[in-house]
């Protein structure tokens, strides 16, 4: 075996170990989907560090000319082996880790991925090959903390000539030793072609909400080399004009040839108790303005007087007829597996694949920004959730452990939450009027859902990820976008690309797109894809032949190959998207699940246009493919920094145009929305209206609504004596936390 880093001897050829053990509970079997424990991460890290051939160092060493472990996460076994284990009682697949190593301490630096196993006691390491025809370029690697530190130190030195310029125009400095210092936000892609690592940096004042405080200066830095001495500032842009060096800008400023903008004074508030309170910055979360709701009255909140109705066994969630396993993948985010309803598998996997935000702007950084968030650690920036704000106080909070750009597992406390909540709308209800001022009966089923939630804070933006489970076999996937807008310095020309939000602030136009993998297994793995739509027919009225009648009829389309089931933006997407089993329900219909997409996304880049190759999935609101192990992920950690030659190109999944009739199918779903920033996005984008997602809904899968099994139903029957009979199947619980006793009248009459 020949490897790029030139040390084939490190591969230990070891036979697959038998790690099967006694399985007694759902938790035991579901461990196959569980993230690595801290002990497993440490075992993998220690094993790799012990391999002298690798020459590994700490990731924190301030050099890029080193070999270091960047990421360790669970490596998912092959689906066929997992199903044999889950469904047929075969032995458990070997548990392995995926490890990414940056090999910078050699003549030709490279990035290599490995499988390390078996866990919990690893003794072999094997290189993982990229998809055929692709490679992992050194320039495509994500930026590490060490590289950011080196970049900041280099920038500090390079822009020393601008010290007075910064003090005069911003009141802040890179060289300051007080709390009035400058920072930067870098954008990507990093250059204009494969192999480059040239980043535009937006210089900002480091205050609360610094994303909204650009100074007007943007700096282009070439940091391609592993030797920091080779790094250099290539260009600067200030207030609409380009400069070749910091020295040129400083010299022209000194002689009055720069159209300088002096920013308004920022009063920094002392956070210590007793300090004089200052007016909050416009970018601050601190309340201001009139608030007409009484502050002495707390808002409503969720209570659980009798405790939770769901169960958590390890990484398995049990709720009513639902059961599923969850995982928080460090590289890409939240995933659920083995989704069962009533003991029958509905989906093998539903997972976040990628999130992108594609911008326009007048400044070089604004026009360059095309964020591909897996390249920024989308799954690892899952910071603590606040009880009562991010999740109800009654939620079960779950920790996560990530090894991402570190030297060991890092604890992210309360990174996920799990909770049941009332929806505020009944799942079903009916008032059966007698049309005489009374009723025959009233019936309703209380609306409750179970929610699994996490967030990803990718620098300025916060994504809230939800998987929602309803008692009628419906599962919903949602993404809410919030956080600070990505903003640049205001110039009049910038109004073509955004909105002026403050004196010197432009909120840049952008489109959010999120990609999901939905591996539906509807009553088995042999499924077909079809759509239903209506078509109007004009017929002679059979009971009045002299008249015509127009009515809708059903029109079904069956899709036999992948190309037919790849729907491009701009093409009409049928409303009823059905994944069907050959099995039929009692009424003769194929047992199916419907995919219902809620999105306002549009295509944002021309197909084949430069960086678009990294996000070819964004051509399709829906594409259906045959399951392949080589097509597990639609993006990668590397697509951001080498979008011109990415190692994962989704379009290639469709090239072989495979048969999709009675096959194991995967739906790839793109959702998103255009965001034109507006003044109400200050200080933050709010969640209402900035939510997209999809549902999977049973469609003739059952013989009737499975929520009939719920005991949350209430039926009211009128009685002649005036006292209505309330029929319920769960006793009305009475204590200080419960609502007033249930009552229902049902009459209506003139007054």
Curated annotation (Swiss-Prot):
Ca(2+) 2 binds at residues 562, 653, 656, 658. Glycans are attached at residues 61, 110, 538, 745. The modification 2',4',5'-topaquinone is found at residue 461. Inhibited by amiloride and amiloride analogs. Topaquinone (TPQ) is generated by copper-dependent autoxidation of a specific tyrosyl residue. N-glycosylated. It catalyses: histamine + O2 + H2O = imidazole-4-acetaldehyde + H2O2 + NH4(+); N(tau)-methylhistamine + O2 + H2O = 1-methylimidazole-4-acetaldehyde + H2O2 + NH4(+); putrescine + O2 + H2O = 4-aminobutanal + H2O2 + NH4(+); cadaverine + O2 + H2O = 5-aminopentanal + H2O2 + NH4(+). Disulfide bonds join 391-417. Its EC number is 1.4.3.22. Residues 1-22 form the signal peptide. The keyword Hydrolase does not apply. Catalyzes the oxidative deamination of primary amines to the corresponding aldehydes with the concomitant production of hydrogen peroxide and ammonia. Its preferred substrates in vitro are the diamines histamine and 1-methylhistamine and it could therefore play a role in allergic and immune responses. Has a broad specificity for diamines and can also act on cadaverine and putrescine, two products of amino acid catabolism. It could also act on polyamines, like spermidine and spermine though less efficiently, and regulate various biological processes. Homodimer; disulfide-linked. This is Diamine oxidase [copper-containing].
């Amino acid at each position: 075996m020949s490897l790029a880093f030139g040390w084939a001897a490190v591969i230990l050829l070891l036979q697959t170990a038998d790690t099967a053990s006694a399985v007694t509970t759902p938790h035991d079997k579901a461990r196959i989907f569980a993230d690595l424990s801290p002990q497993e991460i440490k075992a993998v890290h220690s094993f790799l560090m012990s391999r002298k051939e690798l020459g590994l160092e700490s990731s924190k060493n301030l050099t890029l000319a080193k070999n270091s472990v960047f990421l360790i996460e669970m490596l998912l076994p092959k689906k066929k082996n997992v199903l044999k284990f889950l469904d047929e009682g075969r032995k458990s697949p070997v548990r392995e880790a995926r490890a990414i190593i940056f090999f910078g301490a050699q003549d030709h630096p490279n990035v290599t991925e490995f499988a390390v196993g078996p866990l919990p006691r690893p003794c072999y390491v094997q290189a993982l090959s990229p998809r055929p025809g692709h490679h992992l370029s050194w320039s495509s690697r994500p930026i590490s903390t060490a590289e950011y530190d080196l970049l900041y130190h280099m920038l500090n030195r390079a822009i020393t000539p601008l010290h007075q310029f910064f003090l005069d125009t911003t009141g802040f400095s890179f060289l300051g030793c007080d709390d009035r210092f400058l920072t930067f936000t870098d954008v990507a892609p990093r250059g204009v072609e494969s192999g480059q690592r040239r980043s535009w940096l937006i210089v900002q004042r480091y205050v609360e909400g610094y994303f909204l405080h650009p100074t007007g200066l943007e700096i282009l830095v070439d940091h391609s080399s592993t030797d920091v001495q080779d790094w250099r500032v290539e260009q600067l842009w200030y207030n609409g004009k380009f400069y070749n060096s910091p020295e040129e800008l400083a010299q022209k400023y000194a002689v009055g040839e720069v159209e300088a903008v002096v920013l308004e004074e920022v009063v920094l508030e002392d956070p210590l108790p007793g300090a004089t309170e200052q007016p909050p910055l416009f970018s601050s979360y601190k309340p201001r303005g009139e608030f007409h709701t009484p502050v002495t009255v707390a808002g409503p909140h969720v209570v659980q007087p009798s405790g939770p109705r769901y169960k958590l066994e390890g990484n398995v969630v049990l709720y009513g007829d639902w059961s599923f396993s969850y995982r928080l993948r460090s590289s890409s985010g939240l995933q659920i597996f083995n989704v069962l309803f009533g003991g029958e598998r509905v989906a093998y996997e539903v997972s976040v694949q990628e999130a992108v935000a594609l911008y326009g702007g007048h400044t070089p950084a604004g026009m360059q920004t095309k964020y591909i968030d897996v390249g920024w650690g989308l799954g690892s920036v899952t910071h603590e959730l606040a009880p009562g704000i991010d999740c109800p106080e009654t939620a079960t909070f779950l920790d996560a452990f990530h090894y991402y750009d570190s030297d060991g597992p890092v604890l992210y406390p309360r990174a996920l939450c799990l909770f049941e909540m009332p929806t505020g709308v009944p799942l079903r209800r009916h008032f059966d009027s007698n049309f005489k001022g009374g009723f025959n009966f009233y019936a309703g089923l209380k609306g409750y859902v179970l929610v699994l939630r996490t967030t990803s804070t990718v620098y300025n933006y916060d994504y809230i990820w939800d998987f929602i489970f309803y008692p009628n076999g419906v599962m919903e996937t949602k993404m809410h976008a919030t956080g600070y807008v990505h903003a640049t310095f205001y110039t009049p020309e910038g109004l073509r690309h955004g909105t002026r939000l403050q004196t010197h602030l432009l909120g840049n136009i952008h489109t959010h797109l999120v990609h999901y993998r939905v591996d539906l297994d509807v009553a088995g793995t042999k499924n077909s894809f079809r759509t239903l739509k209506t078509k109007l027919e004009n017929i002679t009225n059979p009971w009045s032949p002299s008249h015509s009648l127009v009515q809708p009829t059903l029109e079904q389309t069956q899709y036999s190959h992948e190309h037919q089931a790849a729907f491009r933006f701009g093409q009409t997407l049928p409303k009823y998207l059905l994944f069907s089993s050959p099995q039929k329900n009692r009424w003769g219909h194929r047992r199916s699940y419907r995919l219902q997409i809620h999105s306002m996304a549009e295509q944002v880049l021309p197909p084949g246009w430069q960086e678009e190759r990294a996000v070819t999935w964004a051509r399709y609101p829906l594409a259906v493919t045959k399951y392949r192990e080589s097509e597990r992920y639609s993006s990668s950690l590397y697509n951001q920094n080498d979008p011109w030659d990415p190692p994962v190109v989704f379009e290639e999944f469709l090239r072989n145009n495979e048969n999709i009739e009675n096959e194991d199918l995967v739906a790839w779903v793109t959702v998103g929305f255009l965001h034109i920033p507006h003044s109400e996005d200050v200080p933050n984008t709010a969640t209402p209206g900035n939510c997209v997602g999809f549902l999977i809904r049973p469609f003739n899968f059952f013989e009737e609504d499975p929520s009939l099994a719920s005991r949350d139903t209430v039926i009211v029957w009128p009685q002649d004596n005036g006292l209505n009979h309330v029929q319920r199947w769960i006793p009305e619980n009475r204590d200080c936390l419960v609502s007033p006793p249930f009552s229902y009248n049902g009459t209506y009459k003139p007054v």
